[in-house]
């Protein structure tokens, strides 16, 4: 059983060559590649006096942040912590969830929720900053309406897929990075002493002496916010392509940052009133650079939107998020479209734009959430290194160094909380609460599923099959078995077959679903429990694979029929002689929680919130990819109150006359 579609383009992403490197530029580096649009501007607006020591110190911080955070942590370490080629915080968690640390899921959902929050602010700030460049040509242009129009188009086209434009992202980003590097290099020539910023001494002096060091660090951190994308996109492009491309990208970025710094030192009186990014552009290239910046902002936005869809798809299979309707607008493997999330993101981005109005105010909201994501990734990487047998000393040194660095950045970004950082923290907090409630509620539901030994019921199921006094319910009856222990079955499933309405069928199929720690696993095993009557199928599904049970079961059945392990021809003579297969019917056992069933207030609150959150999801039959015309849903109460209460009979004693 194999995953259905896989684009030839995607297949070649991992090959190291010009095409692979070009595609990597478009997929991976959109976010970090647009940072020069706003980083230097943010530094200048921290309130620190603009002079050579300030600019050299800030540039030194940028260079060494890119080196320590992006190059060493992500390119050299994190990209090696792959899950069968896939990267990202949830893929890393999937590798570690079998560890004894039961609370480790908290790190994953904190990191994922803040990463998703960052995905809402990124399109807003990148597109707004790019369009603001038009003000240098015509100060009266309506920036907000133009920005909203572009954002609307970006989110609208998601429903059609981005296969065609996605192939051109790399072709577009190559000249973008060359533009960054070349214009930066020309500007450096006007102030060669700016190259002293490579010396970390200037960063240390600035942080030691500046009273605004925390504000400067908060602005500097914006240069590496796209580093998490390098890790998340590992599965799309491969480690070697990302590592090689990063060498080129980092060089172009540093040249541009240095060029902006050189321009600032040559134009100190006017530096605060303009964006240095556009100021270093020759007048003849200004309009072209604005168009290029807008295009790069669109690429960055598209990468964040696609990344959000992928993260939530993984979260669904890891039981962190309710199942939602997922569409595949193209045949490209892994390209998803989640309509409700697309709409929610669009509304969120529009609110951010209308709330903050300009990129300078958005900078305050940017960076805080992604700092938390990076800190969670560091902690998970520490567990990963330990699980792989890396020296305890090296593991402690790695975790200690990066926890310290990222805690400093977190502290610096907290200074922006009241100015706008509260926005992404609020969004991330809501997403975390939803994930936490979902995880806890799912554990409660699983805990109170009563399981019984299946072999105790072989005989009665066989008897029901041959009892012609019972109306035939279906030729093939399929149940999803939620019992966790091998050899057991959900008692409500047995109740459905035997007690509620005895269901006679030719074949009974019990489907057990196990979500694997690997991304693309799609396998099954089949056990015949009662010959020609009862079968147990276990499907092993990777965390990036949608559980389309109806499709997979059809493939399994075709495989079993071809190997002559089962005969599914209809038992009706008129159909059997024409080799017509029997029909299938799925029974879904849906447990309904009633708050009064438990005296535990915490569980009541969790389950009530769970019921509210589940409303954004789809029902079980759609979540499992079942043909709804073949599905019967049976609702049963979820009993959590396990207290031993009994009803006493009132004995009435007749009075003797």
Regions found by a protein language model. Name each.
Residues 2-657:
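The structured alpha-helical core of multi-pass membrane proteins
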């Amino acid at each position: 059983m194999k995953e259905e579609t896989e684009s030839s383009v995607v297949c070649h992403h991992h090959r190291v060559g010009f095409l692979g490197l070009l595609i990597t530029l478009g997929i991976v580096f959109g976010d970090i590649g647009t940072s020069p649009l706003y980083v230097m501007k943010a530094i200048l607006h921290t309130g620190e006096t603009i002079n050579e020591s300030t600019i050299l110190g800030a540039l030194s911080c940028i260079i060494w942040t890119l080196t320590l955070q992006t190059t060493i942590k992500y390119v050299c370490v994190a990209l090696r912590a792959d899950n069968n080629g896939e990267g990202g915080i949830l893929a890393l968690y999937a590798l570690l969830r079998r560890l004894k640390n039961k609370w480790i899921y908290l790190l994953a959902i904190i990191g994922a929720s803040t990463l998703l929050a960052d995905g809402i602010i990124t399109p807003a700030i990148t597109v707004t900053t790019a369009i603001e460049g038009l003000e240098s040509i015509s100060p009266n242009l309506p920036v907000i309406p133009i920005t909203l129009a572009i954002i609307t188009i970006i989110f609208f086209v998601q429903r059609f897929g981005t296969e065609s434009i996605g192939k051109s992202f790399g072709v577009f980003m190559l000249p973008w990075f060359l533009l960054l590097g070349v214009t930066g290099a020309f500007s450096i020539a006007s102030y060669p002493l700016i190259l002293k910023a490579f010396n970390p001494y200037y960063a240390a002096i600035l942080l030691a002496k500046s009273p605004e060091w925390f504000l400067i660090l908060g602005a500097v951190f914006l240069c590496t916010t796209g580093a998490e994308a390098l890790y998340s996109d590992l599965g799309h492009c491969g480690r070697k392509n990302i590592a090689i491309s990063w060498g080129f990208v980092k060089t172009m970025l540093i040249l541009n940052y240095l060029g902006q710094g050189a321009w600032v030192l040559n134009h100190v009186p006017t530096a605060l009133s303009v964006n240095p990014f556009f100021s270093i552009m020759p007048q003849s290239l200004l309009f072209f650079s604005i168009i290029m910046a807008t295009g790069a902002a669109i690429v960055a936005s598209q990468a964040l939107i696609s990344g959000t869809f992928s993260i939530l798809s993984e979260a669904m299979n890891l039981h962190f998020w309710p199942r939602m309707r997922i569409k595949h607008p193209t045949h490209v493997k892994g390209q998803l479209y989640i309509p409700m999330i697309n709409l929610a993101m669009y509304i969120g981005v529009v609110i951010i734009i209308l709330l903050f109005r300009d990129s300078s105010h958005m900078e305050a909201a940017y960076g805080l959430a992604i700092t938390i994501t990076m800190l969670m990734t560091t902690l998970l990487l520490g567990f990963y290194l330990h699980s792989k047998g890396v020296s305890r000393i090296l593991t402690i040194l790695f975790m200690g160094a990066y926890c310290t660095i990222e805690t400093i950045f977190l502290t610096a970004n907290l200074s922006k909380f009241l100015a706008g950082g509260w926005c992404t923290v609020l969004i991330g907090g809501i997403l975390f609460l939803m994930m936490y409630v979902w995880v806890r509620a799912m554990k409660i539901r699983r805990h109170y599923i009563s399981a019984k030994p299946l072999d105790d019921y072989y005989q009665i199921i066989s008897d029901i099959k041959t009892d012609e006094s019972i109306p035939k319910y279906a030729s093939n009856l399929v149940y999803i078995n939620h019992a966790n222990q091998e050899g057991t079955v959900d008692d409500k499933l047995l109740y459905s077959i035997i007690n509620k309405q005895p269901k006679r069928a030719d074949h009974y199929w019990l489907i057990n679903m196990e979500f694997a720690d690997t991304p693309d696993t799609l396998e099954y095993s089949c056990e015949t429990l009662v010959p020609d009557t009862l079968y147990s199928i276990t499907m092993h599904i990777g965390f990036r694979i949608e559980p389309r049970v109806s499709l997979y079961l059809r493939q399994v059945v075709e495989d079993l029929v071809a190997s002559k392990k089962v005969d599914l021809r209809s038992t009706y003579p008129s159909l059997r002689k024409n080799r017509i297969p029997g029909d299938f019917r799925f029974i879904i056992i849906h447990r309904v929680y009633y708050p009064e069933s438990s005296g535990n207030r915490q569980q009541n609150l969790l389950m009530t919130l769970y019921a509210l959150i589940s409303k954004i999801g789809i029902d079980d039959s759609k979540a499992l990819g079942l043909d709804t015309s073949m599905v019967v849903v049976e609702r049963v109460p979820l009993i959590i109150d396990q207290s031993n209460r009994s009803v006493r009979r009132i004995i009435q004693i007749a009075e003797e006359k």
